[in-house]
């Protein structure tokens, strides 16, 4: 495993940083999963509220965009409203999480088609990243089921489905980073791309996962406050809703990263491979 070891000085700095990350995890482990879940479902909660306050506007959009008539447009808005609020409540209460995630995934797919997001690569990347967050949420429930057999000796990775779901969720989070990139040749933009890509790659392969995810959460949160400060925009400006949408979708991905911090990268990761070998 020498290929994963840094030189002496760097190794010492990394060890200190990892110790700090572990200390953070120990202090927050009781409430971090709850914060992670709330962040992850925040985009659905915000969108459900928006559906309620823009009920007529959403129906009109569907009728004009798809020529579907009043009845189908009303069904669309009703499903988007109740299909987000109820699953969010189920997830926060830890009730039928698999069903709740399935409903939320159907909302993501439905909105991707209904709002023509398939042809907007930036918004499509965000939706895919949110799907990755839902996979991480499902993997968390697999972790809870596996814990019923705590204390029983096992060899290797005892929960393959959970490990592959964690891997898929981490990889899909890459799409959030891609949607945030601005290809401008300024020093700060190049620095953002290099640092962000390095961090998201480390999280995806599961190397120094908790440390990388903590740094990425801080980086994404700061970037989110800078790029998507929707509360500074007057309520009569149409792009306020777009900024709010971007803000809460980024918060959902941050929630996914917090789940990675809380539960680790799983069996299909460099960190786990190092432990076993």
Curated annotation (Swiss-Prot):
Signal peptide: none annotated. It is a multi-pass membrane protein. Its main location: endoplasmic reticulum. The di-lysine motif confers endoplasmic reticulum localization for type I membrane proteins. A motif (Di-lysine motif) lies at residues 274-277. Belongs to the SURF4 family. GO terms for biological process: Golgi organization; negative regulation of epidermal growth factor receptor signaling pathway; negative regulation of vulval development; nematode larval development; positive regulation of protein catabolic process; protein exit from endoplasmic reticulum. This is Surfeit locus protein 4 homolog. Pfam families: SURF4 (PF02077). GO terms for molecular function: cargo receptor activity. GO terms for cellular component: endoplasmic reticulum; endoplasmic reticulum exit site; endoplasmic reticulum membrane; endoplasmic reticulum-Golgi intermediate compartment; perinuclear region of cytoplasm. Disruption phenotype: High rate of embryonic and larval lethality. Some mutants reach adulthood but display severe accumulation of vit-2 in large granule-like structures in intestinal cells. Keywords: Endoplasmic reticulum, Membrane, Protein transport, Transmembrane, Transmembrane helix, Transport. It is found in: Endoplasmic reticulum membrane. The chain crosses the membrane at residues 71-91, 97-117, 118-138, 163-183, 187-207, 213-233, 250-270. Endoplasmic reticulum cargo receptor that mediates the export of the yolk proteins from intestinal cells by recruiting cargos into COPII vesicles to facilitate their secretion. Required for the endoplasmic reticulum export of the yolk protein vit-2, which is synthesized as a lipoprotein complex, from intestinal cells. Involved in endoplasmic reticulum exit sites (ERES) organization.
């Amino acid at each position: 495993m020498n290929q994963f070891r840094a030189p002496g000085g760097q190794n010492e700095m990394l060890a200190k940083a990892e110790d700090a990350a572990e200390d953070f995890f120990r202090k927050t482990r009781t409430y971090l999963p709850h914060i992670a879940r709330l962040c992850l479902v925040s985009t659905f909660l915000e969108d459900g509220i928006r559906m309620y306050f823009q009920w007529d506007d959403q129906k009109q959009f569907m009728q004009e965009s798809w020529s579907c008539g009043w009845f189908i447009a009303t069904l669309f808005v009703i499903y988007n409203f109740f299909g987000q609020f109820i699953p969010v409540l189920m997830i926060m209460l830890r009730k039928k999480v698999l069903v709740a995630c399935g409903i939320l995934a159907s909302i993501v797919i439905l909105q991707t088609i209904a709002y023509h997001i398939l042809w907007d690569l930036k918004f499509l990347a965000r939706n895919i990243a949110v799907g990755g967050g839902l996979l991480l949420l499902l993997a968390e429930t697999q972790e809870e089921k596996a814990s019923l057999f705590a204390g029983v000796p096992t060899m290797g990775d005892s929960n393959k489905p959970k490990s592959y779901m964690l891997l898929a969720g981490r990889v899909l989070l890459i799409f959030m980073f891609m949607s945030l990139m601005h290809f401008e040749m300024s020093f700060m933009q190049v620095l953002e791309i290099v640092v962000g890509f390095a961090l998201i790659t480390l999280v995806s392969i599961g190397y120094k996962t908790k440390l990388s995810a903590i740094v990425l959460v801080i980086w994404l949160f700061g970037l989110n406050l800078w790029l998507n400060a929707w509360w500074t925009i007057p309520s009569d400006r149409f792009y306020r809703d777009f900024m709010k949408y971007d803000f809460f979708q980024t918060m959902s991905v941050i929630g996914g990263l917090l789940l990675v911090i809380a539960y680790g990268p799983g069996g299909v990761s460099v960190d786990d491979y190092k432990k076993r070998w």
